[in-house]
Amino acid sequence: MEIAQRYCVQVDYQLRGKNYYAIGFENRASGYELRNPFFKGSTPPKDITHFDNNHTRCNVFEGFIDFLSAEKLRFNDLCDVVVLNSVSNIGKALPVLTQYSLIACYLDNDDAGRMTLSKIQKEYGDKVVDFSRHYPDHKDLNENLMWMCPKKTNKYKLKF
C-alpha cells in the first residue's frame, strides 16, 4: 500500500453521467495509466515513465503493476526504471536506454513481451538481460509475486 501511494494517485472521472475512480500512474508526458477492478485504460498523451536517478543499470517493465511488484521486492534499489506503459511505446523507450550499461528486462511471458525483448536486444545486444526467465510459469512479475505470497498481495484491492 505504501509503495502504491508513493507512485500513484487516485483519479476521479465521470463517464456518461456516472462517477468513477481509478488508480493513476503518471507518464513523462503527464498522461496517466488507469486501473480499477473493472477498467484498464489511459489518458492521453500515451508515453513511457522514466525514473532517472543517474544509475548505470535500468530495469524495464511493460506496465506499472509489474513496476510496483518490483518495488515491493526491492528490485529497483540502485537502478533507474523505464515503464513502457504499453509495448507499443518501445520506440519511445529505446533512445532513453542508450545511457545504460545494463538493461534488465522484466517483461511479460507472452508473444508481445518476447517481441519487445527482441527489439531491445537487437538495439543493445549484450547489455540486455532477460529476467522473465526467473518467472517462466507466470504471465508476468506481478502474477509471480501473487503466487509467492497470495495472502499479502491482491492486485485489485488497493485503496487510497
What are these regions (language model features)?
Residues 1-20, 156-160:
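TOPRIM metal-binding catalytic domain and adjacent DNA-binding surface shared by DnaG-type primases
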Residues 9-96:
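Phosphate-handling DNA/RNA-contact segment within nucleic-acid enzymes
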Residues 72-160:
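TOPRIM fold recognition
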